[in-house]
Design a protein with these regions (language model features):
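Aromatic (phenylalanine/tyrosine) cluster motif
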Residues: 3-4
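Short hydrophobic alpha-helical segments enriched in small aliphatic residues
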Residues: 11-18
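N- or domain-start disorder-to-order transition segments that initiate the globular core
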Residues: 21-46
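Charge-rich, well-structured scaffold segments of protease-associated domains
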Residues: 29, 40, 84-237, 244-245, ...
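Active/ligand-binding-proximal structured segments within catalytic/core domains
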Residues: 40-91, 165, 267, 277-289, ...
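His/Glu-based metal-binding/catalytic segments typifying zinc-dependent metallopeptidases
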Residues: 41, 50-52, 236-296
């Protein structure tokens, strides 16, 4: 059980109002290797269910790049007993919601409903997980849909800029591939390709079912046993551990000319892997430096200098790898000024670190975001499910809160100096005129 202490009002005020919120969570390991992560909440009437499968970009070879995401689409196109309409109609008929997403390391299918309809949601998710039809005619149609999704991404400059940045930054590792794949690889896939990948990775010891909401532990276990555990016909013997290669150090830029009004700019610096304990210091640095409207980047580059509408930075963490990303978009004539302004704020951070007041603000924001996440069963399902599929462990709120409280301004400064390595930064620009050398400006500006 975890307790969060949120202090309301001035941190120096002796009259503090303290609220404690208890979270009970549990991981159940089934004989097949399947894991259930359960987070009860009797204060709500909803139940969120997520099926997390360790199938993402990191599992794909270059010739099948994008297959994890393609399967995410195809399981909605029908099972052996349900048509694509049946799937969504059954969910809509009970007022529930169903969706899915693919990340670099995993795929997730999830629902949210009132508690009395949790069994129906689990039944639909189970059917999609175990029995996708992979009909070739439906595959041909959905292939066109995903290609249009790629076209849409390529027509969205910020998406294009960031995707090209990460593919270049992680060049040489499994993470360099785009989640959507390429038009070429998609055109070469057929039903047999999808079935082979599905049969290999949609197995018990590569799956976590995450349940959050108004169920008892006994009800959650019975639900998962009925719709998942009892349906596995054999226990997979192959280890599902995925050894993701560390990124090769390099500092390069990618450029894309596009007839657009603004210049889109992004940088990536090497940072910490998922579950690295230094990640808390990085998160606190992110809040102070680049994430919120009161952050240094926002206040300087947008509010004081008026050089852009959008500027932010955030960490992206994976197994054995991580990137800290900074993005902005501005008019061509302001591109160099914006990069210099960003570099100036980085230099100030590296020289002076964060103040105690900024650190306390960051801690309050980070703890508050964790606590408020409890109020959404969907958020809790995602937090616990994504952590379990990536680490095999239960997310420890007590530990995270203790880490936040224990982090010092010196820890944040040390993390900042480890992350902002200008000899190892990569850049991406999408613009009508890509002649500006943003990488050199970032590396050399003073």
């Amino acid at each position: 059980m975890a307790y969060f202490t949120i202090i309301q009002g001035d941190a120096t005020d002796d009259m503090r109002h303290v609220a404690k919120i208890a979270i009970m969570q549990k991981m159940i390991n089934f004989p097949s290797g399947l894991k259930l992560v359960f987070v009860p909440n009797t204060a709500v009437r909803s139940v969120a269910i997520g099926v997390f499968v360790g199938a993402g970009v990191v599992r794909e070879t270059p010739d099948i790049a994008g297959i994890s995401h393609f399967i995410e689409h195809m399981v909605f196109k029908g099972t052996k007993t349900r048509s694509s309409f049946d799937i969504v109609n059954e969910i809509d008929s009970i007022g529930a919601q169903i969706n899915a997403f693919t990340a670099k390391s995993y795929t997730c299918f999830h629902t949210v409903s009132i508690d009395t309809n949790a069994d129906k949601c689990a039944d639909v998710l189970s059917d999609m997980y175990f029995n996708p039809a992979f009909d070739q005619e439906e595959l041909e149609k959905e292939r066109r849909v995903v290609i249009e999704e790629i076209n849409e991404s390529e027509d969205t400059p910020d998406d294009l800029c960031l995707e090209r940045l990460l593919c270049n930054f992680f060049k040489g590792s499994q993470l360099e591939k785009a989640i959507l794949g390429t038009k070429k690889t998609l055109k070469e896939m057929n039903s047999d390709t999808l079935r082979a990948y599905h049969s290999r990775y949609y197995v018990a010891n590569n799956t976590v079912v995450s349940v959050a909401g108004n169920l008892t532990e006994e009800e959650a276990v019975a639900l998962v046993n009925k719709h998942f555990e009892s349906k596995y016909t054999n226990i997979a013997s192959e280890s599902m551990d995925c050894d993701v290669a560390e990124r090769h150090a390099h500092s390069t830029s990618v450029k894309k000319k596009k007839e657009i009004e603004q210049t889109h700019i992004a940088f990536a610096f090497p940072s910490y892997a998922y579950n690295d304990e230094r990640g808390v210091a990085m998160q606190l640095m992110t809040i102070v430096f680049s994430m919120e409207m009161s952050s240094r980047l926002f206040q300087s580059v947008r509010e004081k200098l008026g050089l852009c509408y959008t500027v932010y930075g955030y960490p992206s963490a994976y197994k054995n790898n991580g990137a800290f990303i900074i993005y902005t978009s501005t008019s061509p004539e302001n591109a160099e000024k914006a990069v210099r302004a960003i570099r100036k704020e980085i230099d100030l951070l590296l020289e002076k670190g964060v103040s105690e007041q900024e650190l306390e603000k960051g801690k309050q924001q980070l703890k508050t975001s964790l606590v408020l996440g409890q109020e959404s069963t969907s958020a809790m399902m995602r937090t616990f499910g994504s952590h379990a599929i990536q680490t095999g462990e239960l997310y420890d709120f007590d530990k995270r809160i203790a880490q936040i409280d224990a982090t010092t301004s010196e820890d944040v400064l040390k993390a900042s100096r480890e992350i902002f390595d200008f000899s190892n930064v990569c850049a991406s620009i999408v613009a009508k005129d890509d002649d500006v050398d943003i990488l050199s400006i970032m590396k050399d500006a003073k």
